[in-house]
């Protein structure tokens, strides 16, 4: 299914051969036992922690050049007693998929190490992520993200997504924090903990994971309770990311309703309202499958109570306002995403998943094939500097015997969700 020679799609319809791209990963990535992490890597410091465990920055020893991010999974814990009852489904999926996937726009796994009942995933180190980049541009006296940089980021993201979808992999959690960027401007899709194969599933995708995709990037068919879904859910998330790169804030910033004690998934009323405010009310005339959605009656109730029955799409108004407020040049000049950018955004944010643009179609869109050429380095031509990822020396004990921790004072708790939660309060 997967292959190390999968081609790299380019903007003029050709392919870059995989062999021409540098990779730190040796062939046949798999599990390594009877070896200690510290024998192969020098631990520089601690990056972040979360429900999965902890992440550390490291440098290779004994001829292993380069920097690495080591994810240490923590075992189940009951009180002060660690119970080695196995790994989460998320960890197993991530290890299985990352061991097979190999593409320049998907995060690279170097190896997996088993040490004294602890599992370590060793990834290439990436200095930035899109959430960090977006946050940098929101600070006073800073400008919008340059249009050529957005084009390169989006192209590389779609290129990696095409590889995943071609190999029957749904990511299911695309968001700025999970889109990594190397110091040389290469974009990598990261965090495959919610990813899964969708080729001839034995059960509906809903039966395995009832809640997927962070709420601000969740596709309308998921909000409407669809029991089965397609790669189109990832393309909606790409549209949300595209909009966020342009506006420097989430386009659909709703509040998530949590599951009750019976683990019943509630209708995400507030998030659906945020989408309708910009996209208008979805209608069965343009989305025939809408009426069969489990939450259709909830949508009707929402439309009646909020006066949404005649709400029309205002995405173009939002787009033009965004360009004006962020100082992009009018028209289709090199310094603006232009009309082609709006057309691509509208196709990504299509309500009906059967009509939503695919990754392959998006890569062939005029937004990429006309105007300023796409660069392989998204930072090309940008004179500014982004801050390095925070690495602390306060807690860099990666030993398997050390107790895997959770949140600690002064340290980020799950950088992927913690920063998003902070922005929700703003």
Swiss-Prot record:
It catalyses: L-seryl-[protein] + ATP = O-phospho-L-seryl-[protein] + ADP + H(+); L-threonyl-[protein] + ATP = O-phospho-L-threonyl-[protein] + ADP + H(+); [DNA-directed RNA polymerase] + ATP = phospho-[DNA-directed RNA polymerase] + ADP + H(+). GO terms for cellular component: CKM complex; mediator complex. The active site is at 173 (proton acceptor). Residues 390-426 are annotated as: Disordered. The keyword rRNA processing does not apply. Component of the srb8-11 complex. The srb8-11 complex is a regulatory module of the Mediator complex which is itself dependent transcription. The srb8-11 complex may be involved in the transcriptional repression of a subset of genes regulated by Mediator. It may inhibit the association of the Mediator complex with RNA polymerase II to form the holoenzyme complex. The srb8-11 complex phosphorylates the C-terminal domain (CTD) of the largest subunit of RNA polymerase II. This is Serine/threonine-protein kinase ssn3. The gene is ssn3.
């Amino acid at each position: 299914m997967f292959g190390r020679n999968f081609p790299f799609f380019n903007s003029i319809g050709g392919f870059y051969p995989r062999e021409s791209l540098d990779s730190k990963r040796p062939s046949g990535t798999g599990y390594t036992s009877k070896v200690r992490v510290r024998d192969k890597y020098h631990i520089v410091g601690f990056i972040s922690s979360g429900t999965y465990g902890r992440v550390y920055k490291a440098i290779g020893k004994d001829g292993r050049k380069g920097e690495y991010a080591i994810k240490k999974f923590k075992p189940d814990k009951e009180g002060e007693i660690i119970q080695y009852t196995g790994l989460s489904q998320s960890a197993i999926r991530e290890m299985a998929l990352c061991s097979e996937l190999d593409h320049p726009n998907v995060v690279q796994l170097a190896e997996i190490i088993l040490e004294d009942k602890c599992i370590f995933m060793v990834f290439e180190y990436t200095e930035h992520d899109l959430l960090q980049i977006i946050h940098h541009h929101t600070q006073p006296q800073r400008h919008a993200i340059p249009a050529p940089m957005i084009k390169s980021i989006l192209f590389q993201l779609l290129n990696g997504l095409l590889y995943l979808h071609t190999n029957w992999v749904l990511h299911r959690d695309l968001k700025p924090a999970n889109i990594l960027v190397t110091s040389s401007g290469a974009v990598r899709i990261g965090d495959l903990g919610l990813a899964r194969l969708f080729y001839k599933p034995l059960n509906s995708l809903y039966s395995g994971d009832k809640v997927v995709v962070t709420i601000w990037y969740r596709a309308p068919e998921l909000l409407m309770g669809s029991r089965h879904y397609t790669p189109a859910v990832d393309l909606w998330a790409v549209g949300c990311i595209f909009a966020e790169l342009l506006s420097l804030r989430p386009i659909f910033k709703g509040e998530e309703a949590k599951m009750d004690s019976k683990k019943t998934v509630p209708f995400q009323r507030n998030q659906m309202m945020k989408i309708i405010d910009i996209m208008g009310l979805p209608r069965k005339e343009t989305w025939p499958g809408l009426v069969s959605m489990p939450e259709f009656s909830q949508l009707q109730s929402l439309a009646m109570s909020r006066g949404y029955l005649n709400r029309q799409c205002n995405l173009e108004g939002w787009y033009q306002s965004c360009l004006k407020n962020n100082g992009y040049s009018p028209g289709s000049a090199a310094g603006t995403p232009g009309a082609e950018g709006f057309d691509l955004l509208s196709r990504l944010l299509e309500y009906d998943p059967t009509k939503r643009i695919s990754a392959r179609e998006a890569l062939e869109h005029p937004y990429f094939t006309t105007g300023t050429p796409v660069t392989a380095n998204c930072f090309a031509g940008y004179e500014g500097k982004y801050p390095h990822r925070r690495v602390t020396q306060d807690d860099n004990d990666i030993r398997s015997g050390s107790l895997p921790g959770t949140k600690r004072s002064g340290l980020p708790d799950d950088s992927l969700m913690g920063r998003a939660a902070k922005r929700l309060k703003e």
